[in-house]
Amino acid sequence: LNEENTVEPEERDASTPSPVLIVPGHLFFVDRINLPQALESSEIDDFAELSLENLAPFPVEQLYWGYLYSKSAGSILLYASYKERIKAQGYQHIETYLWVLPDFATLFGAAFSDATTLQLEGDESFSRITFAAEDSLPQQIISSPEVQKLEGEHAPLRLKLESTEVN
């Protein structure tokens, strides 16, 4: 990669990790997984990791991954990306971050009274996100580096991501 394609965090004391690195959503695999009814809240972390181990072609240690959970949804939204894929995009000093998240995770907790489809536009990614009425976990997320791949039906709500520093 040349220097023009390199994304670097602001200079900071290496002993103080930055909390969050937000990267384009299209770099992540996403799956909504129903939770077994008998599953206790304390078991969700283990369930998510086991689910990921069954789905991912790479060991969990080689992934940036996480999940979104809403108690009322009865499911989790599992997301993962191969660490080398993120590094290949030019992100440097990733180890200084506590979390590496897809841009669509910034909408966690959003809920709409009616079924809603929105388009989240970042600098390098476009995500079409579909919510069922009153559900804070998306039913579906389709992300792409090109907006043309997501066009078709009209997304009634468009949101533009702005770069921000999270401290």
Regions found by a protein language model. Give the residues of each.
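Hydrophobic/aromatic-enriched cytosolic interaction surfaces used to assemble or bind macromolecules
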Residues: 1-167
